[in-house]
Amino acid sequence: MYRAKVYVYPKEGILDPQGKAVHQILKNMGYKAVNGVRVGKFVTLELNNALTEAEAYQQMEEMCQKLLANPIIEDYRFEIEKVTEEQE
């Protein structure tokens, strides 16, 4: 089995109201060292062993482009790891 971790976040230059709100609250709480906050999504998926590693990467790329991220306003990256029975 493969486990995929997907990180989706607003593109640079795209307004991020959640990030701005979190940043302001952190400043109000006294965390003055925080220069900026971007709020995104984290998704995990489990893919079965019927796929090769190359197929898993290809399918993850397609899933990110078609559903998990909006490529107009969001960037994404993903990691895939092989999971053994002991790790499940």
Predicted feature residues:
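Long, contiguous binding/interaction regions
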Residues: M1-G40, N48-A50, A54-V83, Q87-E88
